[in-house]
A protein has these predicted regions:
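Short, flexible loop motifs at catalytic/binding sites
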Residues: 1-117
Length: 117
């Protein structure tokens, strides 16, 4: 997808990191940044390849995730070590979502029991 505003043009590529062979989709490409949506569901090889492809000076990474365990590799290496990686860590809870009613929040909480509660 190509987006132009004024004299600036950006090209966006969309890939999935669903399995171990996914890293090959982006191998060899030069990127100025990546947005990895639900990064905890992606394979580590895809994530590491995406980060390695960000070779333009000033490249940025954006992640969002809901790791299923405090032992998840992404949680261990990025969330817990965000300061060492010069990363901004922002945490949100269900209650932070202004579009969710209290009834919906309670329903979600009753459906999803996890170690995070």
């Amino acid at each position: 997808m190509v987006v132009t505003k004024g004299n600036k043009t950006n090209t966006f590529y969309v890939y999935g990191g669903k399995d171990e062979s996914s890293y090959m989709l982006i191998q060899g490409i030069t990127l100025a940044g990546v947005l990895l949506d639900e990064v905890a569901l992606m394979t580590r090889s895809f994530v590491e390849q995406a980060l390695a492809r960000c070779s333009i000076s000033g490249s940025k990474y954006w992640f969002n995730c809901n790791p299923d365990s405090p032992k998840h590799w992404f949680y261990q290496e990025w969330v817990l070590q965000h300061k060492a990686k010069n990363a901004l860590h922002v945490h949100f809870d269900l209650e932070d979502n202004p579009s969710l009613t209290e009834k919906i929040i309670n329903r979600y909480k009753s459906m999803n029991q996890s170690i995070w509660r």
